[in-house]
């Protein structure tokens, strides 16, 4: 079955102090990519600059599996990176991400960092960029509870950076919790 579509991903977190745009990579699922980029800015960044941050993060996303497989069809453009899928390293990278933000913005606790934080997932494939808002369910947990597909913001891949930035702001405004 070869219904896998090459995709690129990014994740956006925003609170009252900053917007953080990170590259995510994967194959069907995705996760924070240490080989990607991170952009930090104040929440009042222009739509143009915000859109450029998103485009750059997506451009660094990798279509990647941990290792070659012979038992299933694998998309011909996939690359391989075992470290990206190492669960221990994934936890370490997340902890480093949290620590970096806490130090950079002077937070003393995780609660202060994550208070009122909004999160959007971005997926780019085919001809569309889909920005999905989330619900802040617990301190460090976001999910889709109470959201509908119509809450997603869908843009053409040909959208200008300003349109992408404005679309992200719209999706962030639809975040719950």
UniProtKB/Swiss-Prot annotation:
Note: Encoded in a defective cdi locus that has been inactivated by gene rearragements and deletions.
Lineage start: Bacteria, Pseudomonadati, Pseudomonadota, Gammaproteobacteria, Enterobacterales
Entry function: Immunity protein component of a toxin-immunity protein module, which functions as a cellular contact-dependent growth inhibition (CDI) system. CDI modules allow bacteria to communicate with and inhibit the growth of closely related neighboring bacteria in a contact-dependent fashion. Neutralizes the toxic activity of cognate toxin CdiA-YPIII (residues 954-1077). Does not inhibit toxic activity of CdiA from other toxin-immunity modules.
Protein name: Immunity protein CdiI-YPIII
Recorded superkingdom: Bacteria
Organism (species): Yersinia pseudotuberculosis serotype O:3 (strain YPIII)
UniProt subunit comment: Interacts with the C-terminal DNase fragment (residues 954-1077) of cognate toxin CdiA-YPIII.
InterPro entries, A to Z: CdiI_Proteobact (IPR009888), Cdil-like_sf (IPR037891)
Annotated Pfam families: CdiI (PF07262)
């Amino acid at each position: 079955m070869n219904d896998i579509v090459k995709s690129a991903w990014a994740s956006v977190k925003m609170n009252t102090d900053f917007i953080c745009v990170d590259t995510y990579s994967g194959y069907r699922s995705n996760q924070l990519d240490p080989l990607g980029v991170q952009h930090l800015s104040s929440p009042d960044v222009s739509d143009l600059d915000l859109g450029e941050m998103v485009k750059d993060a997506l451009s660094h996303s990798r279509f990647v599996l941990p290792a070659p497989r012979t038992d299933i069809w694998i998309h011909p453009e996939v690359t391989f990176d075992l470290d990206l899928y190492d669960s221990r390293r994934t936890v370490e990278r997340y902890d480093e991400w949290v620590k970096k933000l806490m130090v950079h913005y002077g937070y003393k606790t995780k609660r202060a960092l994550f208070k009122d934080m909004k999160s959007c997932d971005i997926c780019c494939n085919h001809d569309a960029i889909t920005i999905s808002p989330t619900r802040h369910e617990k301190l460090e947990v976001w999910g889709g509870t109470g959201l509908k597909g119509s809450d997603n913001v869908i843009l053409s891949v040909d959208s200008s950076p300003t349109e992408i930035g404005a679309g992200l702001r719209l999706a962030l405004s639809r975040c719950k919790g």
